């Protein structure tokens, strides 16, 4: 009998059985009759106990493609394609992404017909190029990375400073990508190892992540970036790290960077926020502002960090201070998606920053007011448009989880993209391999897409590899009939397009 074809769109993440790709086998109904020669039972046997339900995930991420990320954390590169058991019985076509697409996701990737760079690669290889010939090795803020990815900053929030962050650190090291450690880790959790009542010692949250990364990091790739905000500066976090012998291997190999945090995409203009119990709030009140926003009888309080104050001159002086006082560490700076992001980025590069990170309004966080999550900050696509051709290393974060979104950011000028919520959800799904599988799937998509554009490195990508849908039509109040120029939303690449 011929299996009928169905015409359907591929799921955003393949719908997989619990055992990947195992075909479903019909189960015959149980025979309840008494076999010949068997005496009847006086009572039916007790049913076998039901299997214990799988533990519920520790993390949820509303508004984020959590289901698709978890599928990639389980299946790796297999999740890039539809379920192979449907091959031959289903016809596939495009499907809209789940949930509302932002401006970056609405951009189409547009391979050309004529590909001179593919011809150059063919001559170089003496054969037809394939997608495996794409080299994803990237220089990120002074580090060498195997992929144009890095692990975004997890700070002192509960989700970002526990065991999941340690698992993510270890897997990022094995992937050969840099890791950023977020703000307020030392003011909240301390720095040195602390003794327990039994005489054992426990590592601080920051050192636990550093040691997990160093234990798994290959030689010559990756690196650790440590953020500092106002409260961190009061604790002299960078001085502690720079003088700690534990960080000597990173300094000696040029794999340590310090990142000045000026803001974040999820709450631009505000400092970090966490929810703490009343006992912890009393301890933290010496360093942070604590507010009773949840009610006088609530067991929790809001801990707030100050955002810091920056002008063009203050930022320039801060970056020069970092370069002069910590000459062996790379200098990074992170901006929220402010309306003057282009001016801020140019100022940072002029002051010698090795990397400038822009965190789009789609970026995640451990805690923020809803009005900021929904209404504040520039979308990542607009922030990249305003920056235009970067004058140095530009890094982008904000809802990155798959290769298409990553490629759009790279084509708009970013050198690499950060994985934040996607990384935490992946290690929540599989603490040992989830992030690696997620990165493997993303890397495969990047190789496929970059080669389809007739290019073979991420640095070769440019805005003309993209097409943005036109805005709703509005009549031109002063049309120029002599002009037939089509104005797109993104600037044309400068000659050479420095990346």
Question: What are the language-model segments listed below?
Answer:
Residues 1-7, 54-146, 160, 170, ...:
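Conserved, well-structured core domains of diverse proteins
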Residues 5-57, 477-487:
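Intrinsically disordered, low-complexity proline-rich tandem-repeat tracts
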Residues 58-83, 230-237, 241-257, 261-284, ...:
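Anaerobic metallocofactor- and corrinoid-dependent redox/one-carbon enzyme cores
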Residues 149-155, 180-182:
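Short glycine-rich or small-residue beta-strand-to-loop segments that form or flank ligand, phosphate
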Residues 151, 172, 356, 409, ...:
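Conserved, mostly hydrophobic/aromatic
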Residues 169-170, 174-321, 325-348:
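Active-site-facing alpha/beta catalytic cores
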Residues 298-444, 473:
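Glycine-rich phosphate/ribose-binding loops and adjacent secondary-structure elements
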Residues 434-499:
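Extended, intrinsically disordered, low-complexity segments
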